[in-house]
């Protein structure tokens, strides 16, 4: 199973293809088996706060990703899907869009205040934030 914050869910038993219908069926099954409202199940499972996907227009995607890496020299850096910078108590991933001149940022931290603080450090490194 794999998933994205953008709402895409991939299932091995569906040839690793995205399937909203399978995701919906899995959620319905979990709610039925658990007996609690979905809102309670989600609250109990949520451990981190997420930024959601934020888009940035950039002239040079690779250079912007390298600025991010350089700004956090103590971070663990992964380059599996774009660049992930992991500082233990928070992390972010920036990956280039394959269809638009955009970088897509996702950031996760312990709470909304930390997400906001880290976004204010990361965003200026990437380019111009856009709403699409």
What are these regions (language model features)?
Residues 1-132:
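Phosphate-binding and adjacent anionic-ligand microenvironments
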């Amino acid at each position: 199973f794999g998933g994205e914050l953008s709402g895409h869910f991939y299932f091995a038993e569906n040839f690793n293809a995205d399937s909203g219908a399978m995701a919906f069926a899995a959620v319905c099954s979990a709610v039925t088996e658990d007996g609690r409202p979905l809102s309670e199940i989600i609250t109990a499972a949520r451990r981190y706060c997420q930024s959601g996907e934020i888009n940035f227009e950039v002239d040079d995607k690779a250079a912007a990703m390298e600025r991010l890496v350089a700004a956090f020299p103590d971070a663990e850096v992964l380059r599996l899907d774009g660049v992930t910078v992991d500082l233990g108590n928070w992390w972010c991933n920036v990956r280039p869009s394959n269809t638009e001149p955009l970088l897509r940022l996702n950031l996760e931290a312990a709470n909304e205040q930390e997400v906001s603080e880290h976004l204010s450090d990361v965003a200026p490194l990437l380019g111009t934030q856009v709403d699409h």
